[in-house]
Amino acid sequence: FAPLTSRGSQQYRALTVSELTQQMFDAKNMMAACDPRHGRYLTVAAIFRGRMSMKEVDEQMLNVQNKNSSYFVEWIPNNVKTAVCDIPPRGLKMSATFIGNSTAIQELFKRISEQFTAMFRRKAFLHWYTGEGMDEMEFTEAESNMNDLVSEYQQYQDATAEEEGEFDEEEGDEEAA
């Protein structure tokens, strides 16, 4: 969400679409403890609220994509969507909300997995769950699912448009056989 400032200070600053866009993509403003500069965006949605030019919003979003093209996967066309609602949020002249699916989230999943593994190895707190009817195997399965998710995000981060073309050809060969 942008602007990330106190409501009281809002009346003294006039925000621009450019500043909102910059704040949205700023690593310090992310709600998850991962740095998007360590990954690539698969998809992005940005919702702007307030009186502003749709043209300016589109230009700013395109500008971010062009300046930071290495942080966006090229094999998903039109992977950035924007919307503008001309009714501003209460107490603000304009705001923006950002939702991004970035491969950088694997950092967070890896940390959680490491912490889980350390606790599970010691069987810490496990009795509370098994006492309620859960099986130890469910935890092992959840750990495996988490590791699969991390691997999948890593593949998406490393993938290129050329590789996807090769994959399509392989699929066609399998169907022909």
Swiss-Prot record:
Disulfide bonding pattern of the chain: none
Start and end residues of each stretch annotated as Disordered: 156-177
GO MF, any single term: GTPase activity
Keyword RNA-binding: no
Short name of one Pfam family: Tubulin_C
Cofactor(s) required for function per UniProt: Mg(2+)
Composition bias, Acidic residues: 160-177
Any one of the GO BP annotations: microtubule-based process
Record's subcellular location: Cytoplasm, Cytoskeleton
Spans through the membrane: none
InterPro entries referenced in this protein's UniProt entry, alphabetically: Beta_tubulin (IPR002453), Tub_FtsZ_C (IPR008280), Tubulin/FtsZ-like_C (IPR037103), Tubulin/FtsZ_2-layer-sand-dom (IPR018316), Tubulin_C (IPR023123)
GO terms under cellular component: cytoplasm; microtubule
Superkingdom: Eukaryota
The protein's role, per its UniProt record: Tubulin is the major constituent of microtubules, a cylinder consisting of laterally associated linear protofilaments composed of alpha- and beta-tubulin heterodimers. Microtubules grow by the addition of GTP-tubulin dimers to the microtubule end, where a stabilizing cap forms. Below the cap, tubulin dimers are in GDP-bound state, owing to GTPase activity of alpha-tubulin.
Complexes and interactors: Dimer of alpha and beta chains. A typical microtubule is a hollow water-filled tube with an outer diameter of 25 nm and an inner diameter of 15 nM. Alpha-beta heterodimers associate head-to-tail to form protofilaments running lengthwise along the microtubule wall with the beta-tubulin subunit facing the microtubule plus end conferring a structural polarity. Microtubules usually have 13 protofilaments but different protofilament numbers can be found in some organisms and specialized cells.
Family: Belongs to the tubulin family.
Protein name: Tubulin beta chain
